[in-house]
Amino acid sequence: MTKKNLAICSFCGRSEKDVEKLIAGPSVYICDYCIKLCSGILDKTPTPAAQEVSTSQTAPQTSLKVLTPKEIKRHIDSYVVGQERAKKTISVAVYNHYKRIRALMQDKQVSYGKSNVLLLGPTGSGKTLIAKTLAKILDVPFTIADATTLTEAGYVGEDVENIVLRLLQAADYDVARAERGIIYIDEIDKIGRTTANVSITRDVSGEGVQQALLKIIEGTVANIPPKGGRKHPNQEYIRVNTENILFIVGGAFVNLDKIIAKRLGRTTIGFSEETDLAVTDRDRLLAKVETEDLIAFGMIPEFIGRFNCIVNCEELTLDELVEILTEPANAIVKQYTELFAEENVKLIFEKEALYAIAQKAKQAKTGARALGMILENLLRDLMFEIPSDPTVESIRIEEDTITQNKSPVIIQRSPEAIA
């Protein structure tokens, strides 16, 4: 008579007669003793699912700086000139966003909606600077992405989830910090749907990208490849919950004012004087932007619906450009003045010269961005010569230096001072 072979636990080696229960699997067995042992280990070690949930819950446990809207705006004022309406609106939106995170941290029953921000306005009006300044004030990780480089999954280009990777890198791979950071996506208007019937051709960098951005902007757990690039099987991922990340997107939205003017023209019959005035005033028109205008421009309704704060950054005036040159904490004239002071040379800008620089920047139609280029071109040769010339005491930039390309006025030191 053949003796029956006893089944044994594949983990501890106990036979079926030495244990109370032995559970069979494909070619393996596990006893009740080992099950209890493994259960105890799992109770002490968070599972991947638990870690995924806990990241968003534990993120706010680190110090969270929540300033009042007035405090936020006051800090922005130190770096950003003009844009009073935009700064007030964004200050409130950011305050509510981080108040929402704090409410989640305190397990409050009432939850607040997410305060993502859409900034409209011409190039050089301060959209990016506002976002950068916010991140600096709040001491949170910050990254900038260019919407024109993004493509939907399956096409050559950059996956939208790589934006989250950049934020994670800015946070030194601290997931908890990254999950309450700020992402600014520039040139968002460039992914507007360009045709009314998108089924004719595949819009790789338009509607498809808007669809791809929807989930991470609204809030999802994104699987991020640590080294970026495309995803592939058997790859390790870092899970980042985007629910508490503040998304700010910006774009020039060229000709959006015409779409708004057309709508106002249809709805303000009998008020032609007011309408005609608005048509000639782009900033006033953009201040009246509605969701339907952005949809007509080419943004899909689902995407626009993710932004409950839409605000216009107005084109900078001549006086504001001059103020940008001299007033902010990091004003560019202050920077160059300090550079020359390190060479023991005094750099002087006459008021008329500052206005001439501002006028030149305005003509370039790139707003404040042109100011730095104008000054760099103006002072480059001087910065090359001055370190080797101890005879120069001061340099004066006059209006003619800008308008007629005349050389700056250079004042020499006295021989006694050089000696």
Curated annotation (Swiss-Prot):
<dbReference type="GO" id="GO:0051603">
    <property type="term" value="P:proteolysis involved in protein catabolic process"/>
</dbReference>
<dbReference type="InterPro" id="IPR003959">
    <property type="entry name" value="ATPase_AAA_core"/>
</dbReference>
<dbReference type="InterPro" id="IPR050052">
    <property type="entry name" value="ATP-dep_Clp_protease_ClpX"/>
</dbReference>
<dbReference type="Pfam" id="PF06689">
    <property type="entry name" value="zf-C4_ClpX"/>
</dbReference>
<keyword id="KW-0479">Metal-binding</keyword>
<dbReference type="Pfam" id="PF07724">
    <property type="entry name" value="AAA_2"/>
</dbReference>
<dbReference type="GO" id="GO:0046983">
    <property type="term" value="F:protein dimerization activity"/>
</dbReference>
<feature type="binding site">
    <location>
        <position position="31"/>
    </location>
    <ligand>
        <name>Zn(2+)</name>
    </ligand>
</feature>
<dbReference type="GO" id="GO:0051301">
    <property type="term" value="P:cell division"/>
</dbReference>
<dbReference type="InterPro" id="IPR004487">
    <property type="entry name" value="Clp_protease_ATP-bd_su_ClpX"/>
</dbReference>
<comment type="subunit">
    <text>Component of the ClpX-ClpP complex. Forms a hexameric ring that, in the presence of ATP, binds to fourteen ClpP subunits assembled into a disk-like structure with a central cavity, resembling the structure of eukaryotic proteasomes.</text>
</comment>
<dbReference type="GO" id="GO:0016887">
    <property type="term" value="F:ATP hydrolysis activity"/>
</dbReference>
<comment type="function">
    <text>ATP-dependent specificity component of the Clp protease. It directs the protease to specific substrates. Can perform chaperone functions in the absence of ClpP.</text>
</comment>
<dbReference type="GO" id="GO:0009376">
    <property type="term" value="C:HslUV protease complex"/>
</dbReference>
<dbReference type="Pfam" id="PF10431">
    <property type="entry name" value="ClpB_D2-small"/>
</dbReference>
<dbReference type="InterPro" id="IPR027417">
    <property type="entry name" value="P-loop_NTPase"/>
</dbReference>
<feature type="binding site">
    <location>
        <position position="12"/>
    </location>
    <ligand>
        <name>Zn(2+)</name>
    </ligand>
</feature>
<keyword id="KW-0862">Zinc</keyword>
<keyword id="KW-0143">Chaperone</keyword>
<keyword id="KW-0547">Nucleotide-binding</keyword>
<dbReference type="InterPro" id="IPR010603">
    <property type="entry name" value="Znf_CppX_C4"/>
</dbReference>
<comment type="similarity">
    <text>Belongs to the ClpX chaperone family.</text>
</comment>
<dbReference type="GO" id="GO:0051082">
    <property type="term" value="F:unfolded protein binding"/>
</dbReference>
<feature type="binding site">
    <location>
        <position position="34"/>
    </location>
    <ligand>
        <name>Zn(2+)</name>
    </ligand>
</feature>
<dbReference type="InterPro" id="IPR046425">
    <property type="entry name" value="ClpX_bact"/>
</dbReference>
<feature type="domain" description="ClpX-type ZB">
    <location>
        <begin position="1"/>
        <end position="50"/>
    </location>
</feature>
<protein>
    <recommendedName>
        <fullName>ATP-dependent Clp protease ATP-binding subunit ClpX</fullName>
    </recommendedName>
</protein>
<dbReference type="GO" id="GO:0005524">
    <property type="term" value="F:ATP binding"/>
</dbReference>
<dbReference type="InterPro" id="IPR019489">
    <property type="entry name" value="Clp_ATPase_C"/>
</dbReference>
<feature type="binding site">
    <location>
        <begin position="122"/>
        <end position="129"/>
    </location>
    <ligand>
        <name>ATP</name>
    </ligand>
</feature>
<keyword id="KW-0067">ATP-binding</keyword>
<dbReference type="GO" id="GO:0008270">
    <property type="term" value="F:zinc ion binding"/>
</dbReference>
<dbReference type="GO" id="GO:0140662">
    <property type="term" value="F:ATP-dependent protein folding chaperone"/>
</dbReference>
<dbReference type="InterPro" id="IPR038366">
    <property type="entry name" value="Znf_CppX_C4_sf"/>
</dbReference>
<dbReference type="InterPro" id="IPR003593">
    <property type="entry name" value="AAA+_ATPase"/>
</dbReference>
<feature type="binding site">
    <location>
        <position position="9"/>
    </location>
    <ligand>
        <name>Zn(2+)</name>
    </ligand>
</feature>
